[in-house]
A protein has these predicted regions:
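Extended assembly-interface regions of large multimeric machines
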Residues: 1-96, 102-108, 114-161
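Beta-strand-connecting loop/turn residues
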Residues: 96-97, 187
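Conserved, function-critical positions that sit in or immediately flank catalytic
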Residues: 134-224
Length: 224
């Protein structure tokens, strides 16, 4: 259970007047609330979940690409968000599977990307396109909301997230967690964004470009 038990109170024995008082953070007000509520219910850890904003996948909608560098001077191109957490960079599909958008077909000449046409449904752990429309999207599967959490916590506004992600023995959670933590996948580059495509390059495939970062020897292959 919770180390600091929480109780949720309901109701009031008498009506509030039209000028509802503002809550006050002191012992006297806590006693007032306790004296006036109809009943209370202890909230256990089984009845608590972390929540994230619900963004449901919908055909024809543009979703933002995951980027680590959104800020006041580089806002997300669709929602104008100054930080990643306010951008629409992930979705939940109709089967309660959650995905992060790795690529939305955007570039320096198409800054807002394309409309998403294929609903992601796969559970493979490698980022993949969702269908054959050619919409330019690449999705990374994150997790599936469990049936019990759907019943208890599903709402129009929020997605529930497992409380024990780091210790869960659920096979689906373990597979995603271990894949993300593996030496193979840690610090991989899954997407290269071209801000300026330049001019005058010869057509061809397999041209190598150095990656500048905190490692050594990294290269990407560019097809012109």
């Amino acid at each position: 259970g919770l180390s600091n038990p929480t109780t949720s109170g309901f109701g009031r024995k008498t009506d509030f007047n039209t000028d509802t008082p503002s809550p006050t953070d002191n012992i006297n007000y806590m006693n007032f609330v306790g004296d006036n509520m109809s009943f209370g219910k202890k909230v256990t850890s089984d009845n608590v979940r972390r929540l994230v904003r619900k963004i449901s996948w919908s055909r024809g909608t543009k979703y933002e690409m995951y980027r680590h560098d959104y800020n006041l001077n580089n806002t997300s191109p669709i929602t104008g968000s100054a930080r990643l957490y306010d951008a629409n960079y992930y979705v939940m599909n109709s089967d309660f599977k959650v995905y992060v958008c790795i690529d939305n077909g955007s570039s320096g000449i198409n800054t807002t990307g394309n409309a998403s046409l294929d609903e992601p449904t796969f559970t493979d752990l490698e980022p993949s396109k969702a269908g054959t429309s050619g919409d330019g999207y690449q999705w990374k599967y994150l997790f599936t909301v469990s049936p019990s959490d759907i019943i208890k916590f599903d709402s129009t506004d929020f997605i529930s997230v497992s409380n024990n992600w780091s210790t869960s023995t659920d096979s689906q959670v373990v597979a995603v967690r271990d894949n993300g933590n593996s030496d193979v996948n840690n610090n991989q580059i899954k997407k290269v964004y071209i801000e300026n495509q330049g001019v005058g390059y010869s057509n061809g495939t397999g041209q190598e470009v150095n990656i500048l970062g905190d490692g050594t020897g990294g290269k990407v292959v560019v097809n012109v």
